């Protein structure tokens, strides 16, 4: 019974599935991905869905553009009046909504082809589990981790931005969540409700857009790290895979396993996967009979093809996200600086909830920068470890036969892959620390300017 349950679990973990369900739904809410993806064909229903999709997209543009425009007008009207706190607060919202508009256009209109290529290639071609050998890993661990991270991040974004909607309700003064200039009296009955609804929609769009752009990057990095885990296990078991294709007997498999176990002593070999052992009896069921040279070449070529697939996917991700992160690093730097400044200026008696909201904004900005840099760093570290995985196989047993192939792979795999911001700055934990340092340097300068006034 226990064995049957384990077999069913392994079979379920090895199934091919859509890896982007939740993040794709979030992009649809943000109008960064078409709802029509879920409707195939060209019938009446498909036409209706496309029409509703376009209407929803245009409405979202209207909401975001009109709020950004109102804030720009507010900055222009109040410029030079000495209220630096209000000016900076308007500048924060202007940056946020301009970035929201830019992300919608970039994902939906500027580069949808590359986005679809990345998602479809990873979904269609990823390896669900490692090659046959003494042990195996599946994509289940990285898939679960990607779902956990993206859901946590998306919910935090929604909570952080929608919290602003609670302020007017708490104050009960018919104020708006976003304090900006309007060319009419928005406090009139009926008008206030419509304006409040539009601002609420705008805040939801901000949350969805920020969560989609950074969240998809995080999911891609976690899944690629999962593919590296699968590759590492396949490389470690490349000789075991060869022996299985040769039709080795139990004695030969036991001897090879003993030598591999002696070499396989490093803990923490995988980023997200849990390694499981394969019973030797199952390896005997394959029933193949090849010579070692042919069997090894077949097993090794599969590993090389998998490595090329991972590198090709990373190049597409870099091409798509590198321009975004080039602008994003500057945007995050200024946002952290401005939000921290406004938080320190909020000292009025009724500003407690506003300080909480600003504190949430600051934490979300830091959280976003962290996931961008941290998961890119994980990918970079994994890209350097292919050679280590290969050395965990008992290579000395067939040194003469495998030496040239091993050396060829080692030389090529040493070229690690680094995700960047505009091909200028590497995305890693050092970039995270450096951006925070720069932001608080600007904060100090801003506070000195405010003190002079």
Curated annotation (Swiss-Prot):
Cytoplasmic-facing ranges: 1-28, 107-148, 225-322, 381-408
Location, primary (coarse class): membrane
Coiled-coil ranges (or none): none
A single BP term in Gene Ontology: detection of chemical stimulus involved in sensory perception of smell
One Pfam match: 7tm_6
Subcellular compartments: Cell membrane
Family (UniProt): Belongs to the insect chemoreceptor superfamily. Heteromeric odorant receptor channel (TC 1.A.69) family. Or2a subfamily.
Protein name listed in UniProt: Odorant receptor 83a
Organism encoding this protein: Drosophila melanogaster
Lineage: Eukaryota, Metazoa, Ecdysozoa, Arthropoda, Hexapoda
């Amino acid at each position: 019974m226990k064995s049957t349950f384990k077999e069913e679990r392994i079979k379920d973990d090895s199934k091919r599935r859509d890896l982007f369900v939740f993040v794709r739904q979030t992009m649809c809410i943000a109008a960064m991905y078409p709802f029509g993806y879920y409707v195939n064909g060209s019938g009446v229903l498909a036409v209706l869905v496309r029409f509703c999709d376009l209407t929803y997209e245009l409405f979202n543009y209207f909401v975001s553009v009109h709020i950004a425009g109102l804030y720009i007008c507010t900055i222009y009207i109040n410029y030079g009046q000495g209220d630096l706190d209000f000016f900076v607060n308007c500048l924060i919202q202007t940056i946020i909504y301009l970035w929201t508009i830019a992300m919608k256009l970039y994902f939906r209109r500027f580069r949808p082809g590359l986005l679809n290529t990345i998602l479809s290639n990873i979904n269609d071609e990823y390896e669900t589990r490692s090659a046959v050998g003494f042990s195996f890993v599946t994509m289940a661990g990285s898939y679960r981790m990607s779902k956990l991270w993206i859901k946590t991040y998306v919910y935090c974004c929604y909570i952080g931005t929608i919290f602003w909607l609670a302020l007017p309700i708490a104050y009960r003064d018919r104020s708006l969540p976003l304090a900006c200039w309007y060319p009419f009296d928005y406090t009139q009955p009926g008008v206030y409700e419509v304006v409040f609804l539009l601002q609420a929609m705008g805040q939801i769009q901000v949350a969805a857009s920020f969560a989609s752009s950074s969240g998809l990057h995080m999911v891609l990095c976690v899944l690629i790290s999962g593919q590296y885990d699968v590759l590492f296990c396949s490389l470690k078991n490349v000789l075991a895979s060869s022996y299985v294709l040769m039709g080795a007997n139990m004695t030969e498999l036991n001897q090879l396993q003993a030598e591999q176990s002696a070499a396989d002593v490093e803990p923490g070999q995988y980023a997200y996967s849990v390694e499981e052992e394969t019973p030797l009896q199952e390896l005997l069921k394959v029933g193949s009979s090849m010579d070692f040279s042919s069997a090894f070449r077949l097993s090794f070529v599969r590993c090389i093809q998998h490595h090329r697939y991972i590198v090709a996917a990373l190049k597409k991700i870099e091409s798509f996200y590198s321009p975004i992160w080039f602008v994003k690093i500057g945007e995050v730097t200024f946002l952290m600086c401005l939000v921290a400044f406004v938080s320190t200026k909020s000292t009025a008696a009724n500003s407690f909830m506003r300080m909480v909201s600003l504190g949430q904004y600051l934490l979300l900005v830091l959280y976003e920068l962290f996931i961008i840099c941290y998961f890119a760093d994980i990918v970079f570290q994994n890209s350097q470890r292919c050679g280590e995985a290969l050395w965990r196989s008992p290579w000395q047993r067939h040194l003469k036969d495998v030496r040239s192939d091993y050396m060829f792979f080692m030389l090529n795999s040493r070229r690690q892959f680094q995700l960047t911001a505009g091909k200028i700055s590497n995305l890693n934990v050092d970039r995270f620390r450096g951006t925070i340092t720069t932001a608080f340097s600007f904060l100090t300068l801003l506070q000195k300017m405010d003190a002079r006034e």
